[in-house]
Amino acid sequence: KITSMNFRLYSLFLLSLIALFSISCNNSRRIVTHANPDKKPTNIILMIGDGMSTPQITASMISNEKRTSFERFPYSGLVKTHSKSNKITDSAAGGTAIATGHKTNNGMIGMNADSIAVPSILELLSDKGKKTGILVTCRVNHATPAAFISKNINRNNYYEIANDIANTEKLDLLMGGGRKYFIDRNDGKNLIDTMISKGWTYYDTI
């Protein structure tokens, strides 16, 4: 049986534990940064690891004997990238959330859930006269990179996405795979030739 006196003592004990925990947290090692908030960055590089979140970064920190590059960054933040249609996102909806700030349905790229095209941060920076580029280890018309430059209701429309990439005026550098979607096409177009005619310099090896 819990009496009023016992309840008060129990509550006091819990409050004491919380206070001690708060003090221990406040005395933990502080991370001091030397970032200058008034200094504007020369370049912005957005790195996206496929399926990567804080658990993967933590695992890297634990397994790596040396300090990881992530720990050298002066700032860190979190962003929700789940899709409008599912709590478990795919690369298309996740990439669109990062690129545009808009939630969309799984499978859709560069547009919101109502199928309305929305600008990406890459496109907005290009409009301000900044040089932009995409460098990937996958196909350049894959869902994640495509979310920054293409608008399509289906991430699997690789040939349509390749056409968007070839005809954009908001991209200055493109490196990655997926060459066949630019040349082996049912419409007979050679999108690599199209890009060269627009002033691109093409290399098929490094």
Q: Model features per residue range: what roles?
A:
Residues 21-24:
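C-terminal motif of bacterial Sec signal peptides marking the signal peptidase cleavage site
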Residues 2-13:
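Bacterial N-terminal signal peptides that target proteins for export
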